[in-house]
C-alpha cells in the first residue's frame, strides 16, 4: 500500500495526481499483465487461437465452421470480503460481460468456490451467501452452471482467506470475422461510455493502492441493468456498429481507457483525448469500479446510431471524445471537477495526460516487478 491520503477523494491539493495513480494501478499485481505467467506455456497449440490470453476474453476458432468459442474467468475477492453475495454476483457479471463485448452469446458457467472452514458459522455463512449470489446472477442471465468444484478449509494461523468464488463463462460467436476487440482501432473513432458510475470505492484497486479503507463499501449491482447493457453490446456488435469494446471493472474507467489505448492499433498503441463528466467525486468517476459500464468506439458515421441504440435499451450514454495521437488525455468536466477552471460556463480540469508508451510499460512490467522476476 502507498501512503494513506486524508481521503479517498482525488483532490489536487492533497497531492494525488490522477496520472500517477493510473500508472500505479496499471503496474499493481492485481491489474498488471499476466504475460510472465502465461508465456510459460504454449497457448496456441493447433493454431486455433484467435485472441489469446492477456487482453480480455480468449477466443478459439471452431475448425470447419465460421464459429468460435469465447471464454473468460473472473473473481472479485476484495468485494467478497465486504459482501460474499455481491462478490460472487459481480464475478458472474464481469465474466459474462467480457464474453458479451466480443459479440458472443454467453452459454454456460463453471466455478471454483474457495472458502475457509465451513464448520465455523462465519465461513459457512460466506459460502451460503456466495452460492446465493452465483445462483441469482445465473438466473438473471439465463445461464446454467455446467459444473465446478469447491475448495474448503483454506486457513492458516493468520486466519481464513476471503470468500473467493472464481467464475468461468463460455460463449459462442457465430462468425469469428465479426469479433470485437478491446483496443482502440483507428484515429478519429468516437469514444462512448455506456452506463454510469455509482458511489462506492470499497474493494476497489484504487482503495488498495491508496492504503485506505473506503467507508462507503463497494458499489451496488443491478442485475437487470447488467443484462440490458450486455444485450445492447451484443446487438451493437451484430449490427457492425462497433470498432472496439472494453468493459469497466478493476481500476475503473481510467484503467479501462488505458487498456484500450495500450492494446490499440493491433497492439502498437493508440491514444485518445477525452472529457469525462463528474457526477460524483473524481475518484469515483475515474477509479470507482461500478459494474454495468462499457467503453465502446465507433466510426463517426456509426456513432449516432450507437448512441441511439443505447438509449433504446434505456442505458445512460455519453460521448467522451475521440481516438488519436500517442497520449491518453482525460479531462474532468462538471461541478464535481476539482482544480477546475471555468470554460463556457462549466468547470473543466485536466486529470490525466500520459504517453501510451508509459501506460504500456507500467502494465507490462508490473507483475514481474511484484514477483521479483525482472532479471529472468
PLM feature spans:
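Glycine/proline-enriched, intrinsically flexible loops and inter-domain linkers
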Residues: 1-376
